[in-house]
Amino acid sequence: MTSLSTLQAPSQSTNVSYGAVRAFYGHHKCATGWITRIFREMSFHLGRRHAIVHLPRHISPYASLADKVSAESIDVLIYTNAQIHEVQTLPEGSRGFHVVRDPRDVLVSAYFSHKHSHPSDKWPELEPHRDLLQTLSLEDGLAAEMVFSQSVFADMQAWDYKQPNVLELHMETLTADPDAGFQRIATFLGWLDPEALYSFAYRVQVRLNRLHYLGHARVPGPYPLLPVPRRPLATLPPDTLAHILEASRFNRLTGGRSRGEEDVQSHYRKGTPGDWRNHFTPALVDHFKAEWGDLLIQLGYETDHTWGLI
């Protein structure tokens, strides 16, 4: 009989190194909240120690992102406003996936989010910008948003898209088929082995790992509500991943609203690629081309500067 202290998936080691990390690299308004929800659940079930880094001030107590990872024994990193110079400090052997979105849709999504729904309690700089957006027309508001979100576009432009240890993805592809997308991600990270046969004991530990984090969430600190042991595991059973993805469908997160149905007050406003065409004007097209036209080509959303509203 397999004991919980010796359980493993076939052909997989349960040893987890806290040197090299597994990471999600994102950018503001590129489905970072949705991806974080799923990726964090994956790490919970695997019993991995994770950390979410949103802003430079979350790194600044340390000399670099690598120093933070080492000091806090981070195994899974969620870096939602990723900057390449910090990523390049991470230990050799780290692997991650990087998600970008059509910058024009980023702009529109940021405009509506910053005007209506994005929390500002931990982002006080948003408040004066939100007040400004309330006074502007849609066209002028989008122009103002282009200035406010400049760093988001700059980070995407500065990124190194040829890193062999980073899987590059378009948000539009990932949201269109989350099952295929996250299976690809999990395989790239070494977290998924479709050929493995998982023992009952292994599956029990997967559930215990999740309960461990649930206990700490309910009662933070050294004495959790549910004192359940956590054990880092190598791979995630495919049906567990499927369950995680099912719980994160757009209609479940929006109370039954279908993708494409707009609610400007919701964090999950619409979920439709190409929505920028419904909000840009010819003047905004010209403005965006002048500022970030090269970025669209760099990311593969356009092949030249001749694009327009049609």
Summary of predicted features, one role per range:
Residues 1-169, 261-263, 269-273, 279-308:
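PAPS-dependent sulfotransferase catalytic domain
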Residues 49-64, 161, 165-278, 282, ...:
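The conserved 3'-phosphoadenosine-5'-phosphosulfate
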